[in-house]
Amino acid sequence: MSRRGTTEEKTAKSDPIYRNRLVNMLVNRILKHGKKSLAYQIIYRAVKKIQQKTETNPLSVLRQAIHGVTPDIAVKARRVGGSTHQVPIEIGSTQGKALAIRWLLWASRKRPGRNMAFKLSSELVDAAKGSGDAIRKKEETHRMAEANRAFAHFR
């Protein structure tokens, strides 16, 4: 048994302009090769494009998109007696948001388009409306969990 104490859970910091934790989480996920200023640039351009497209508060669109993509349940591979089962597990809110952000960025990178800011803004607007690849990914995950409901007792 470890004598070391448990670590305190780190809370996500908020970004300098919008004072929003979700924006900062997005920036940290979009970050590549330590280029944080470029990541901020991409996010802020995407937010401006959302403002132009929807003519509503872009942060509410972002919140709505992340809320729409956040999964409640996922499947985890579990090996039981020589065979691997996909076991459905519930997901906490923090992990769900992290997954949602990862899926949104994956879907926006896959999109055809000019630049990342344009693709990200389009994906966020679509996700807020309830369509797009990220929403499809969430629904697919929920379907997988529902199909493997029989293995829920393997948790």
UniProtKB/Swiss-Prot annotation:
One of the GO BP terms on file: translation
Molecular function GO labels: rRNA binding; structural constituent of ribosome
Entry GO terms, CC: chloroplast; small ribosomal subunit
Entries under SUPFAM superfamilies matching the protein: Ribosomal protein S7 (SSF47973)
Metal-binding as UniProt keyword: no
Pfam families: Ribosomal_S7 (PF00177)
Gene3D superfamilies from the UniProt entry: Ribosomal protein S7 domain (1.10.455.10)
InterPro entries, A to Z: Ribosomal_uS7 (IPR000235), Ribosomal_uS7_bac/org-type (IPR005717), Ribosomal_uS7_CS (IPR020606), Ribosomal_uS7_dom (IPR023798), Ribosomal_uS7_dom_sf (IPR036823)
Keywords: Chloroplast, Plastid, Ribonucleoprotein, Ribosomal protein, RNA-binding, rRNA-binding
Localization of this protein: Plastid, Chloroplast
Cited CDD domains: uS7_Chloroplast
Record's subunit section: Part of the 30S ribosomal subunit.
Biological role stated in the UniProt entry: One of the primary rRNA binding proteins, it binds directly to 16S rRNA where it nucleates assembly of the head domain of the 30S subunit.
Similarity comment text for this entry: Belongs to the universal ribosomal protein uS7 family.
Protein name: Small ribosomal subunit protein uS7cz/uS7cy
Originating species: Piper cenocladum
Lineage, broadest ranks: Eukaryota, Viridiplantae, Streptophyta, Embryophyta, Tracheophyta
